[in-house]
Swiss-Prot record:
Chain segments carrying region Repeat 1: 7-87
Residue ranges the record marks as coiled coil: 429-553
InterPro entries: AAA+_ATPase, ATPase_AAA_core, Clp_ATPase_C, Clp_N_dom_sf, Clp_R_dom, ClpA/B, ClpA/B_CS1, ClpA/B_CS2
Residues that, per the record, bind ATP 1: 224-231
Domain of life per record: Eukaryota
Taxonomic lineage: Eukaryota, Fungi, Dikarya, Ascomycota, Pezizomycotina
Sorted UniProt keywords: ATP-binding, Chaperone, Coiled coil, Cytoplasm, Nucleotide-binding, Nucleus, Repeat, Stress response
Region: Disordered, residue numbers: 454-473, 908-927
Designated name of the protein: Heat shock protein hsp98
Region (NBD1): 179-428
Disulfide linkage: none
Length: 927
């Protein structure tokens, strides 16, 4: 029967509560008395946030009816409970609770009432009217001094008035129930001190107040980049309303933030979302006090709740009220989303007045951070130094360019404070290691106590002594740690108390309780401030004493000060850019950088020097912050141009592959530029981003290697102009990518033909050759491209002596390769063999690459065969010597198969015969 009836949400809940009550009392039938109890004392609604429920929420409708009919609700409640207890219960409880005929009668009467009153749904008042005519309920009403059911009907009529039940939530008992459910009261939050102080933004707040004071179209929309403080402007307005710092027309208004997610969530049926939205708007328009509705991310309303089958969306429901000025609405959205969603709907857009929220400058950000400092200090229980605030604002502006101030700077402060707090609340390393040691000794003592032999007894005595020593060492450390922790905790609690007192003083002055406000302002607050100063002084004195006696006590164990170093650490962790202060070990490493790089790149002193100087400038902070160091490495093939870049990557990042490499031979066509910076709008792959721009966005501190740069199309190289000059590059979507912290390295073979000229004996480039190479570069590259390069380095040709040094490096590489592949074979190369390899691998035109081929042919091929054959086994030494003028790898074990030997000999002869013919022409660049 109930399946044909349509109930409001509250009536449906009352029926469910009545059924739950019958099950609780183990009654076999559902009776009207169950429904009466459920309506008189409804259970709390779990769908609503009980904490945010309005203070002094009204009593149930049934109670209001009893009171209006001049009855006693308590007597009525007692009579109902008495009747409920008298009902027979079953043990064990019944599996199914059925409806009694009297309950069916009540529902039928409620249904008839609904039809008579032309309501769409059966509401709570229909159920109460039907119950009042039921004999058992009539008896209870008589006990509550209500002799006739008509008194109940009249009371309901007086409360309900002429309202129609045309929606599922039309019979709400609480005033503004929809507002309580779907909005957050920002003025109440400001009153309770739950909103952070708003510093600055006066101009934007004044403009919002001016727009709200208009007669029509009084709806501002705050537009700005993410993180500039759009919501903060509204929070500032809420604080001004609470402090009565607004014009009279806004003096007693409420600022409510609409929760669009809660509004849409759970709206299963068609029309349910619209019903909720209409309920919210109706309550706003019927409210006695002025309500300003704040919708964060207002673009969510465009299409929110639309079913796709002609259903209304939220924006269309708002339009009529916005145009007439009945609804004061503040929106907030980003520039991109405003353009994408709101500008498309001109009718919706014209109802809002734009307020552009600009990004604050670094100095304004510092002021904002100083204002927020106390909140973060109280929350984390740390002290934030002013130097940390200045560092956070400056570093956020310089290194976190993809994000906006003040949001990025606030995040830095917050995370640095959290890091200090976590470090403080974790056990110091020294205590942790001693406790682990003590646990191990206790386990050892427990195990040895069962043993009977003399050695175990002696070991047991020793273990007990060790445990006592560790405990003695640990006791003072624990005491010291607890004392330091206690001091920090006491200070945090004192600060929290001060915050609470200030809040109470503000509340008292707002409420006009001047005596209490004066008492707090001139007695309690100064007293608490004095306590904090005393605690700070005691803590500073204790820390100073510990640091003075650092040799004996080891200094203070915990720190609770956030300084610039902590901020630097967070920036370095986020971006990978080394902005932390140079440690002594790192200083040493940078000072001896040439020595380290020269071990890998042989014979290129000038190139190594120029790269080292650029890195030192960058790390010491003396380089131009807007211009990344850029190099053009020229020289013959195989002289170490790319190798130097790999060595630099290994030096900086401990990984030779930690660089962004572009092989410019892949960028020979003009259109391949879109691969580097991303396809322009309208082209396929517009959203995917470019290889260069995306890599730089992810790793701002990296080495960019443009290999064989002269092979690329001229249009591709022009993109690098602004990258080398201003450290910025714009991708296909118009976003500026920061490239100020990278190192640009380009390699080129231009002018290599001039480098084959006979030079000085040490392989150095003479001035004439240098000029010829520079002319070749000038003839090929644009003047503005060459003019932006920090340093053009011409690599020297490798001499025989340098090739001989490279032999040592290559053999060390082979040894490492064997270890990486779990081959425990040690290679020993005689000095004579090394000289021979150096002589065979020397090629003025091809640099060090022929040496690799010689090593492969003369050593590696033969070594591979011997290892596979078992002539050289794991743990043995492979000796490379010169025999009869040839390089030979000596086997450690005699060969097993003669046929294989003959075959190998034939192969070696064949290799020797072919080798002279396959030798490369070393005079490739000769005219």
């Amino acid at each position: 029967m109930t399946s044909k009836m349509e109930f409001t949400d509250r009536a449906k809940k009352a029926l469910e509560d009545a059924m739950a009550l019958a099950e609780q009392y183990a009654h076999s039938q559902l009776l009207p008395v169950h429904l009466a109890v459920a309506l008189l004392d409804p259970l709390p609604d779990p769908s609503k946030d009980q904490q945010n429920a309005p203070a002094g929420a009204t009593s149930s409708l049934f109670r209001q009816v009893i009171e209006r009919a001049h009855g006693d609700p308590q007597l009525f409640d007692r009579a109902l409970k008495k009747a409920l207890v008298r009902l027979p219960s079953q043990d064990p409880p019944p599996d199914h609770v059925s409806m009694a005929p009297s309950f069916h009668t009540v529902l039928r009467k409620a249904n008839e009432l609904q039809k008579t009153q032309k309501d769409t749904y059966i509401a709570v008042d229909h159920l109460i009217t039907a119950l009042a005519e039921e004999p058992s309920i009539m008896n209870a009403l008589k006990e509550a001094n209500i002799p006739k059911p008509k008194l109940v009907t009249d009371a309901i009529q007086a409360i309900r008035g002429t309202k129609r039940v045309d929606s599922r939530n039309a019979d709400t008992e609480e005033e503004h129930e929809n507002l309580a459910k779907f909005t957050i009261d920002m003025t109440a939050m400001a009153r309770e001190g739950k909103i952070d102080p708003v510093i600055g933004r006066e101009e934007e707040i004044r403009r919002v107040i001016r727009i709200l004071s208009r007669r029509t179209k009084n709806n501002p929309v705050l537009i700005g980049e993410p993180g500039v403080g759009k919501t903060t402007v509204v929070e500032g307005l809420a604080q001004r309303i609470v402090n009565a710092d607004v014009p009279d027309n806004l003096a007693n208004c409420k600022l409510l933030s609409l929760d669009v997610g809660a509004l849409v969530a759970g709206s299963k049926y068609r029309g349910e979302f619209e019903e909720r939205m209409k309920g919210v708007l109706k309550e706003i328009s019927e409210s006695k006090e002025m309500i300003i509705l704040f919708i964060d991310e207002i673009h969510l309303l465009m299409g929110a709740g639309a079913s796709g089958e002609g259903g209304m969306d939220a924006a269309n429901l708002l339009k009529p009220m916005l145009a007439r000025g009945q609804l004061h609405c503040i929106g907030a959205t980003t520039l991109a989303e405003y353009r994408k969603y709101i500008e498309k709907d001109a009718a919706f857009e014209r109802r809002f007045q734009q307020v552009i929220v600009k990004e604050p400058s670094v100095s304004e950000t510092i002021s904002i951070l100083r204002g927020l400092k106390e909140k973060y200090e109280v929350h984390h229980g740390v002290t934030i130094s002013d130097a940390a605030i200045v560092a956070a604002a400056n570093l956020a502006a310089r290194y976190l360019t993809s994000r906006r101030l003040p949001d990025s700077a606030i995040d830095l402060i917050d995370e640095a404070a959290a890091a200090v707090r976590v470090a403080r609340e974790s056990q110091p390393e020294i205590i942790d290691s001693l406790e682990r040691k003590l646990r191990q000794l206790k386990i050892e003592i427990h195990a040895l106590s069962r043993e009977k032999d003399e050695a175990s007894k002696a070991r047991l005595e020793q273990a007990k002594k060790d445990a006592e020593n560790v405990e003695e060492e640990l006791r003072p450390l624990r005491e010291k740690y607890e004392q330091e922790k206690q001091r920090a905790k006491a200070l945090q609690e004192a600060r929290m108390k001060l915050e609470s007192l200030r809040q109470k003083a503000e509340e008292a002055s707002r409420m006009g309780d001047h005596s209490r406000a004066a008492d707090l302002q001139y007695y309690a607050i100064p007293e608490q401030e004095a306590v904090i100063k005393r605690l700070e002084k005691e803590k500073a004195a204790a820390d100073a004493a510990l640091n003075a006696a650092a040799a004996e006590t080891g200094g203070a164990m915990i720190t609770d000060v956030v300084g610039p170093d902590q901020i630097n650490e967070i920036v370095a962790r986020w971006t990978g850019i080394p902005v932390t202060r140079l440690k002594t070990s790192e200083k040493e490493k940078l000072l001896h950088m040439e020595k380290h790089l020269s071990k890998i790149v042989v014979g290129q002193k000038e190139a190594v020097q120029s790269v080292s100087n650029a890195i030192r400038l960058q790390r010491s902070g003396l380089s131009n912050p807007n211009q990344p160091p850029s190099f053009l490495f020229c020289g013959p093939s195989g002289t170490g141009k790319t190798l130097l870049t790999k060595a630099l990557a290994e030096f900086l990042f401990d990984d030779p592959k930690a660089m962004i490499r572009f092989d410019m031979s892949e960028y020979q066509e003009r259109h391949s530029l879109s691969r580097m910076i991303g396809a322009p709008p309208g082209y396929v792959g517009h959203d995917s981003g470019g290889q260069l721009t995306e890599a730089l966005r992810r790793k701002p501190f990296s080495i960019l290697l443009f290999d064989e740069v002269e092979k690329a199309a001229k249009e591709v190289l022009t993109v690098l102009l602004q990258l080398m000059d201003d450290g910025r590059i714009t991708d296909g979507q118009g976003r500026v990518v920061d490239a100020r912290n990278c190192i640009v390295v380009m390699t080129s073979n231009l002018g290599a033909e001039y480098l084959s000229r006979p030079n000085a004996k040490d392989g150095k480039i003479d001035p004439t050759t240098r000029e010829l190479v520079m002319n070749a570069l000038r003839n090929y590259f644009l003047p503005e491209f060459l003019n932006r390069i920090s340093s053009i380095v011409i690599f020297n040709r490798l001499t025989r002596r340098e090739i001989r040094k490279i032999v040592e490096l290559r053999i060390a590489e082979i040894q490492k390769r064997l270890q990486d592949n779990d081959r425990n074979v040690k290679i020993e190369v005689s000095e004579e063999a090394k000289d021979k390899l150096g002589a065979l691998g020397y090629s003025p035109a091809y640099g060090a690459r022929p040496l690799q081929r010689v090593l492969e042919k003369e050593v590696l091929n033969r070594l591979a065969v011997l290892i596979l054959r078992g002539s050289i086994r794991d743990g043995e030494v492979a000796r490379v010597v010169v025999q009869d003028g040839k390089i030979t790898v000596l086997p450690n074990h005699p060969e097993v198969n003669d046929e294989d030997d003959e075959m190998m000999l034939d192969e070696e002869d064949a290799v020797d015969e072919v080798a002279p013919e396959s030798e490369m022409d070393e005079d490739l660049y000769d005219d």
